[in-house]
Amino acid sequence: MDALITKGVDLLVATIRRLGRQVTYWRATQPIRMKVNTSKTAFEVDDGYGGTRIVWTDMTFLVPAADLVLGGQKVTPQRHDIIETDTGLRYEVLAPAGQSEWQYVDPFNKLIRIHTMAIG
């Protein structure tokens, strides 16, 4: 079963690298050019009155983990990093209160889902 999942994840990584959307990932003044897949993610958050409400990220980026390299070191996303699309739109790595800004998508840590909010 692991072999099948590995092949599927590897195929998805290869597809993103070949057909994905070009972005620039920024940490301070250090850029990383990479291809990503984009979507949106819904979160359930406490509404402060004993209930919950649904909050959507402005954009969720699916990134091959091996492509997040700064100064020769593999890194993981950090809150307040910036992702800039090829059209100039900018997104800050953020998630609703109590949620993680990113997580690995697969059991082999080959893909990362990054949650963001639009900043311009």
Language-model-derived ranges and their functions:
Residues 21-120:
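Short, conserved turn/kink motifs that form compact alpha/beta structural patches or helix kinks used as
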Residues 1-34:
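Active-site-proximal polar cores
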